[in-house]
């Protein structure tokens, strides 16, 4: 197994980034991520469609905009495992990147709705900066990093509750829900409640009428399957793969430089 953030994963398996139609590294579900679970990606599926895409591209029959016809598979994966290998078993789900992405999405939506209600631009982020001492990182497109996301969940929700207008306090349900998921299956141990916690989060997300992002899709569709298969929390795997990742990253660097 190897590890990386979702952008890194997509690059190494040969599919397009998260603005593409079929951008999930683990399955063939397309935006807007509605409906039942989709077929899981395999290395063989990506290899086949990337090869066909290149042939059509070279012959002039297809253009880059036609990549969705090939499930956004545009390059050969940088892995040697057999064709039948599922990406979900090959590359563990990066729990920290899920947490960061989902927390920042909740914050963005809360900021928009609070700003609209109050008439004050960036109302939530001004509260976070001045009252909660939670600073966004400019190098991360003005988003909270991992430690700041955890600080918000661990230490600042009571303070936020006091600051929020009553009609927006339901956002605390979302923050508390992702926090329960973090404790249930994002660490090295897996707790029995993880499936219910993820299902409850999905119901809340739907009730808030927030668009499903790639990271929310991965959480809802793939984290329960991965954890049930291995009977361990996500953190266990991302601890185990560090040495292998160092070895792989060296070969990836050589590949990218050539």
Protein language model features and the residues they cover:
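A structural signal for the principal folded core domain
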Residues: 1-258
